[in-house]
């Protein structure tokens, strides 16, 4: 991994962006075991994709993430207390306690929330890209999907329309080998998603999804091309899901050997080791960055835990008045 192509400031920024969702998730897993959150869909081991993609985009370009893309939310610098409040069902959260997962978005940070079907976001991204193209705004739109999401019919519809209308949209496929517990080889026979994209007339690349520098540089190049000359791209990010579909489901259906192989490719450890090896950071600086992020997370958690719980009366503004005549 040659990091010398990127400025030191960029490398340090990517490092902090990588660490934040990892340390955030580790805290969430502790809270889950303590019963302070109800569920969690882990993206541990896949952070480089969310981080590299988000860092390469302009802040006013829309992103359609999924349930493992915490790095998109932290990468857009959403205050951590608001994210914790969302996942703990507090009033400060984006859904004000009415939902405790990733089913939320925010126009302020140009993020469109997902729904569990993991297909419709692709077509909606086409719509945003079409609006940008018609208004000549020179912006790109990014939509995430995965092995399972690509088996949805909307994957076909979205890619076909994007190709025919030459929309400035980039489809990110997190190819982690599984959809829930179904191996990819039981869903499709293509050797890679590049083959699928080419069938629609879409240019595509397959990259190491655990290499944040490669993800970042690839997205810089493709997003710049899409802004200058509207066209769609597909980026297959090869990675692996290091935990269960969600924490309650377990991982017994995945061979242990795969975990051992991919643990050696951990995106944080490999990037961190390269930064140290090439003299970009020292051990002391590394520890200082870790401590700073952990403190920020701890402060946010303590603030949100001290908030009052949602009470039923707070929901009434979403319903009809009880004394209304029908």
What are these regions (language model features)?
Residues 26, 30-165, 183-189, 194, ...:
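Cofactor-binding active-site loop characterized by glycine-rich and histidine/acidic residues
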Residues 1-38, 59:
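Cofactor-/ligand-binding subdomain signature composed of acidic, glycine-rich
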Residues 312-314:
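Acidic, proline/serine/threonine- and glycine-rich low-complexity intrinsically disordered segments
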Residues 111-299, 303-306:
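Glycine-rich ThDP/TPP pyrophosphate-binding loop and its adjacent helix/strand module
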Residues 316-322:
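Conserved small/polar residues in nucleotide/adenosyl-binding loops
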